[in-house]
């Protein structure tokens, strides 16, 4: 007599083993992905600029450049006095903000603050491909170089009034130049900073004119 013997066949669900995905050699890492996302707007087209906004912006730039060259600290100009005080707000904010990271950044924190805010504004307009906004933000950013240059040049003569009537011990750039042992090169450093500011301002205006011509031709 024979017996029917059933052959054992393992279920497929036990045979199938999930394997971890093998990373591709050409797959970008996290930093590369973040960088690609950050610079992605560079491939987008700029918004066109018509002649009226370009003309109005150019007139404003010309007036501001004249005032920057003749009355930077706003002794005779309400507009420049207002602009200087706006910059001063971000300057004073920068001190406690960067002091969180230690005294090394706390001293130049004022200057970093008044440069960082316009830079953030400029980058925001750049990401939106806003031509006029980017130009205005860039102008503001480089205008702060002129403001900083005045503060630098005062490191030796100590003629500028400081907030709260404080003395030379509270002068950011005198302290920094003393720490770096470059107080004797104050004029050179301040002059270079001022030159960079003017070069940046003229470059921004020239770029805006170029973008207007591109919009006009298209």
Language-model regions, residue ranges each:
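Active-site recognition of the HExxH zinc-binding catalytic motif
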Residues: 84-99, 110
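Generic hydrophobic alpha-helical membrane-segment signal
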Residues: 79, 83, 98, 132-135
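Metalloprotease/metallohydrolase-associated module, dominated by Zn2+-dependent proteases
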Residues: 37-75, 104-218
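Low-complexity, intrinsically disordered extramembrane tails and loops of integral membrane proteins
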Residues: 1-43, 218
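Low-complexity, intrinsically disordered, cysteine-poor segments enriched in small/polar
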Residues: 30-37, 85, 89-92, 179
